[in-house]
Amino acid sequence: RRSSDLKMLGTMSLLLRGLPFIFQGQEIGMTNTNWQSVDEFDDLNTVDQYHLALKAGLSEKDALDKIGRLSRDNARTPMQWNTSSNAGFTTGIPWLRLNDNYPDVNVAAQEKDADSVLNYYKKLIALRKSDTYKDIFTYGKTIPVFLEKEMLMAYCREKDDKRILVLGNFGEKKEALHLSAEPKKLLLSNMNHTEIGQDIILAPQESAVVLL
């Protein structure tokens, strides 16, 4: 996936009301694994689904492809720390195979890249925990807006006299929006924009956090 997609998904979830939860690897954009055999799975439900697919007439390859996309084990593979053996996770034998992309997708590489998914997550967390905005993100109301926009997820976080608009364009086309008043400040953009106005055009997979 593109890094803009991953940053947008993080924006839309971490700024909702409730306790933010980051599952291992989410913050660097770890992906599903390219499974080679049903024997590589640890999840019993996945193995059961594989055998049911064979009984239904699927070939071994098709059955493996289908269960591989949906298996819970995709979210359980070892954390990809660096490019060393076993992605720096262990000197032993990991319980699940490593994702083949760990030489490219790992913490060490993203720490050095200012525009990485990992460093964007750090900005998100810093914004949510900042002295200026932590109360609104922790205790503020969450009000859905722009409901007529099918491919747009948008909500306002509101508390006392503060309002923050969170926008995410899930579509493959630009989304044009008009605000009722000039916004005060663009707090965060997954595409590194620094300014925003009353008329907003969001690119595909663009997110924006706007102080109203």
Model segments located where?
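Loop/helix patches that line or flank the sugar-binding groove of alpha-linked glycan CAZymes
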Residues: 1-164, 170-175
